[in-house]
Amino acid sequence: MAKNKSQYDSTLNLPKTLFEMRAGLPKKEPVMLKDWDDNDLYNQLMKHNEGKPQFILHDGPPYANGNIHMGTALNKIIKDIIIRDKNMEGFQAPYVPGFDTHGLPIELKALSSVGDKKKDISKLELRQICEKFATEHIDIMSDQFKRLGVIGDFEHPYLTLKPEFEARQIEIFGEMAKKGYIYKGLKPVYWCPDCRTALAEAEIEYGEDDCDSIFVRFHVSQDPNGVLAKHGIPMDKTYFVIWTTTTWTLPANEAICLNGQFEYSFVKIGDEFHIMATELVKSVMDACHIENYEIVGEPVPGTEFELMRYNHVYLPKEGWVILGDHVTLESGSGCVHTAGGHGVDDFNVCQKYPQVPITVPVDDGGYLTELAGKYAGQRVWAANKTILADLTESGAVMGQVHIKHQYPHCWRCHHPIIFRATEQWFCSIAKFREDVYKAIDTVTWMPDWGHDRMKGMVRDRNDWCISRQRTWGVPIPAFYCKKCGTYHITDATIKAVSDLFRKEGSDAWYKYEAEQIIPAGEVCEKCGASEWTKDTDIMDVWFDSGSTHAAVLEERPELRFPADMYMEGGDQFRGWFQSSLLTSVASKGCAPYKSVLCHGWVVDEQGKQMHKSAGNGVEPSEIIKDYGADIIRLWVASSDYTVDVRAGKNIFKQLSEAYRKIRNTARFILGNLDGFDPNTDCVADDQLQEIDRWALAALDDLMVNTSAGYAVYDFNKVYHAVYNFCVVAMSNFYLDVTKDRLYCTNGAGRKAAQTTMYKILVALDKIIAPILCFTSQEIWDFMPKTEGMNKYVVFEEMPKAG
């Protein structure tokens, strides 16, 4: 039987190829990576495309503090597909990876590594430990990115801790300060008691917390306008009713705010009178479970109560009744507990009343101070319960409702934060907000809803708090007059600090005294003195990464400003997209990017967020080990990444089947090109059969569709076009019906089919090259070559229809 089979086989032209059916990507990919590294693939590609128009995709720097995850993989692979495609589309598209290397997470890990010694080490020693930690993770993450097939200048990444970067960042700060956009002032800011530092809006995440919402009554003490007497209400039995969800802020209460446009009623309960917004009386009474009450007299405009006085609920002080437009009728009582030291609206309205003090009875660790009286020393969260218990016992609490609400948390430690008024450095967004709007309009946003999202965020944001009370970062380059305390920033001081940092790095700020840094001859503009101290704060890390348009795009010779594209996840609208936009508009008057492309989050197969505790996470290393990096790349291309992208073992298993069909299409063609020399064996178009011309027309359609997909970064469209072409047009039809010609003859019909298949495979391989970077190169290595074809498929030009 075997003999007969052998005799039969000899009469057929059966496919022959060493291109394996089983991909074996986990073993093959590292071999290819070594070849790319040995042959300096990235730099050779840049040299190959020298002189062509540039396409600059500027890399947003990931934080250098751990292994990559599926979200990072999604991000880097999208970028790599774009870079590879652009380099095949007639551009020189360099890719300079970057790393964000300063900030609290690294500092906390550094402190943890020294244990009990952390109290004994100097700031300079701590910074050196931080730098070592960051640089170690840069190498780890770079290797993980390269394992995904990402090509770029990983030998020379940009790092926010490099002296030349820090120097340029200081210059950006100086340019903004010179224009009046930087100032220092007392304002309530997001404050993390656990990290003991101020936070920016971009560093806040919201989570659901339980809390007690309470209605508290404050006893009226003075009625200078005679409002109560006018309406026959006894002052000694009258109270303002406020509502709050932050009981711990009551020690800081200095005012009660009403809205002058609302009407307020006197609500009699027993023989006592309670002032609250007329429209909210019923809801307050219901919440307090009070059934027997009476509204006395006619409603009174809120304006009539202005500058009345009341006694604090337990401290020996009086507060003021003031007016503010931020008071609404959506909840509460229409009388807002106002603590200017612990809320932005509170602070702003208190600024209109100089007689109202700003009190901050909370220290940087979240503990109440002596200003809180008997509660001094209690953490604010614990104080909630003790203050509530005491006020309930004293009769000050009218009602209490246990609720769940969205509350801000620190995105670093994930613990609840507080608002706390402190002296901080700010960037005054209000001064150049209109310029930012104009810059937003010049940018192409993908998806286009990004335009309105960014505009809305800029419209709604307060001034940017750019100072942090930590050690690992770029210092605020400000000096203070020892005599009068006025801060001092001039062109000369900025240049001195920038030059020093460029030479020695920002560690120099901690090595030298102020007099050793500040230029000779500088005098205080206020008092004329010339003795100085240095600022002790560092800049927000978003100011670091927000300076890359200057420190990287303008400084690296292979790049340019503005970038053609910034591409990151949707969270960067409040992060890197925005900080870059603000610093660029403030310093240069324009956006740092021509276009912004945004992707969604990676979620599990059910659409839920991935959490280690839930056991629903998938690590890139696991998928690479089981399937290879090309399957992760195919997952990226097959997804609509503009929304949340699902990932899971079942999804990757299905994708491996789709990959196998694409691979087997290539393998079948390679097998039938055995012995085919495209330099001598290709036939003219007029010698092709009708079915061959149909196949080439289908190829033209594929090129049109994939070209359109790549042009708008719709890789999902590219993937589906390729998959359908391989499965439907090729495997199910053309390759099937041409088997007789291929297997049974050696004449013109076979040559025509081989010519057609060769053209198809060359084009198909180039089309999939940006996505399946490993498999496309493997196919390319096995493919018969014509003169002028490059060793690496990524050096080729993307095929065009016609």
Role assignments for model-derived ranges:
Residues 2-25, 31, 35-39, 111-251, ...:
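Residue patterns forming the tRNA-binding/recognition surfaces of aminoacyl-tRNA synthetases
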Residues 100, 189, 193, 200-207, ...:
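Acidic, turn-prone loop/beta-hairpin segments
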Residues 83, 90-102, 264-309, 503-506, ...:
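Carboxylate/His-rich catalytic cores and anion/metal-binding grooves
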Residues 2-4, 84-92, 113-123, 143, ...:
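Secondary-structure transition/capping motifs at alpha-helix termini
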Residues 47-109, 169, 242-251, 257, ...:
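N-terminal catalytic cores of NTP/NDP-binding nucleotidyl/phosphoryl-transfer enzymes
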Residues 359-368, 592-599, 603-604, 644-654, ...:
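Substrate-binding beta-hairpin/strand module that engages nucleic acids
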Residues 222, 319, 353-366, 470-472, ...:
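Alpha-helical recognition segments enriched in aromatics with Gly/Pro capping
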